Amino acid sequence: MAGIYIHIPFCKTRCIYCGFYSTTYNDIQSRYVDAVLKELELRSDYINEPIETIYLGGGTPSQLHFDLIEKLISNLTSSSDVARHCKEITIECNPDDVNDELAALFRRLGVNRISMGVQTFSDERLRFIRRRHTAEQAHKAVDTLRKAGIKNISIDLIFGFPDETMDEWIGDIDTAISLGVEHISAYSLMYEEGTPLFSMLERGEIKEIDEELSRRMYYALIDRLTASGYFQYEISNFAREGFRSRHNSSYWRAVPYIGLGAGAHSYDGHSRQWNIDNIYTYIYKVENGTIPYEREELDAVTRYNDMITTALRTREGIEIKEGGFYDYMMSSAKKLVSEGLLAVDNGHL
């Protein structure tokens, strides 16, 4: 099994572009953590292989009270089996939440990878998307984590803001490189229906950048990061040698995983499950011994297609093996290979 994903939906404020399930009601954090741990008990039969990674995402996991972070991670890692096999524990953070006490707590609990939502080093754009931190706080957060002994830091960047220029984006890339972090993820700004950002676009208050500029920004990202020693191992992800995200890499290889918490998703190799995305209903159901999720059984074609679309995002692509999947995949890919859009190389598509 790839690992455990725990969704922590709490946020102080909502960013205008975010489509993930989140809530600003922080008064029920303790009940929520207890519910997550109880869900893990209720689904113990789901975990039939060693856990290799643990990932706390959100929302904003760094918004949890310190004692609840400790309770959650300590319970997850209390088993000797997990302690022996788990190679990566990641927690997502906002730069403005990072201080000496929190960084020391992470180190003491065995958290060995931090993923920080920096997004941009422009204070103006940070205010536009309603991020709480400043560029200065992002720099300080990296320094604080380093002083605490955290050796694996990833930051997220966004490009393609309305009116953003190529020079401004290159400035963000170069600033990220100067921080010396081990991993950088970068995504084009998405206008998801239901978000305030999408509504602003519909009302004509902002404009998307044109597709050609977005393409040039993406290639500038690749060129500058690879020239600085980062390896692009997935469409949006770049890492120093030895610092790929183990947890996310397992997703792209279609390795089974379990998701805990409101709105979390799971995959067991044959079906997808997703928890209800209402925190109050989630807590109530779990407290009463019910797992509040829906399930979709996947036929072979759906599994194959899912595997193809995720694996083709990666540098290695899909490992080619003889068998039913091979026949299906190669028959589907034949035309694209002949047109030069896909390639077969060293046992991979």
Question: How should these model regions be labeled?
Answer:
Residues 337-347:
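A short, conserved structural fragment
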Residues 9-20:
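Local cysteine-cluster metal-coordination motifs and their immediate loop/turn environment
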Residues 1, 22-43, 49-326:
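C-terminal scaffold of the Radical SAM
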Residues 238, 346-349:
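Short, Lys/Arg-rich nucleic-acid/phosphate-binding segment
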Residues 1-8:
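Immediate flanking context of iron-sulfur cluster ligation sites
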Residues 5, 321, 341-343:
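Conserved active-site loop/cleft motifs that coordinate metal ions or position small ligands
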Residues 8, 262, 346:
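Pocket-edge structural micro-motifs
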Residues 324-338:
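Short amphipathic alpha-helical interaction segments
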